[in-house]
Design a protein with these regions (language model features):
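Short aromatic-glycine-enriched beta-strand elements
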Residues: 95-108
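Short glycine/threonine/proline-enriched tight-turn/helix- or strand-capping micro-motif at secondary-structure
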Residues: 59-76
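Conserved positions in beta-strands of structured domains
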Residues: 88-93, 110
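Short coil-to-beta-strand transition motifs
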Residues: 76-86
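Sec-dependent N-terminal signal peptides of Gram-positive bacterial secreted proteins and lipoproteins
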Residues: 1-27
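Netrin-like (NTR/C345C) domain of secreted extracellular proteins
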Residues: 20-57, 138-236
Length: 236
């Protein structure tokens, strides 16, 4: 009887050990799929940082035609990029240099497809467009005559919203693939910044590990969808 009880007890202990191992394995798998932690913060600071205008501000919207450089050829965009990365957007900020509006994305790299950047790096990516106070635009372009219908007080409370035709607004937590180049030394942007090769080199996650490229041709915007594996093959 005593031997039977000991055998029964040993079986129970063995079951707990097996279940515990399975739970540990599950926890390990879950942790490997958790959000990537920050390895290196390579982001840059801004001298000017504009908030999204409030409801009391006037906003004038300007739309620019898209850059048609290689816009239909993702493989070509990848080939001329310094880095191709998958990222999660951590922050979106608006600034300007020499009267030109820029949007700064601070992004956390979750995968690297090309280049020397590492998973866990945080970098700053600059895109043309965004919000800029009208007064800053006028100071940079000396074109107050274009806004002669506005009073001095109205100019102070007016923002320009500059966008590329057909481009989707990026938001915090967006999952993107970016084709980037390091900003050149003669650029007004901060040292250590990155820029998109083209707005079509910014692809948006669309579920099931697929990404969408937006292409504007004349007045129409079309979408091309790629699997993540297909994009990886283009970088090989």
């Amino acid at each position: 009887m005593k031997k039977a009880f000991l055998l029964f007890l040993m079986l129970i202990i063995a079951c707990f050990i097996i279940i515990g191992c399975k739970d540990f394995s599950n926890n390990t798998n879950n942790s490997s799929n958790a959000n990537v932690g920050v390895l290196r913060d390579l982001s840059v600071n801004l001298e000017k940082n504009y908030s999204v205008p409030d409801s009391d501000s006037n906003v004038i919207e300007l739309t620019s035609p898209p850059d048609e450089l290689y816009q239909n050829d993702l493989k070509k965009l990848i080939s001329i990029s310094d880095d191709v990365i998958r990222v999660t957007v951590q922050n979106v900020a608006y600034t300007s240099y020499e009267g030109v509006a820029w949007t700064k994305l601070d992004v956390l790299i979750t995968d690297t497809l090309k280049g020397d950047l590492k998973v866990g790096d945080v970098i700053s990516v600059f895109n043309l467009g965004g919000y800029i106070p009208l007064s800053e635009h006028i100071e940079g372009h000396n074109d107050a005559f274009r806004f002669k219908n506005l009073s001095a007080e109205e100019i102070k409370t007016t923002f320009l919203k500059e966008t590329i035709d057909g481009e989707k607004t990026v938001q915090k937590s967006d999952d993107l693939i970016l084709c980037l180049v390091q900003t050149p030394k003669n650029s007004p942007l901060p040292n250590g910044a990155y820029e998109r090769v083209s707005y079509t080199g910014q692809l948006y996650a669309d579920g099931d590990n697929k990404f969408v490229q937006l292409i504007t041709d004349s007045s129409e915007t079309t979408e091309k969808t790629y699997s993540y594996d297909d994009i990886k093959k283009m970088t090989e």
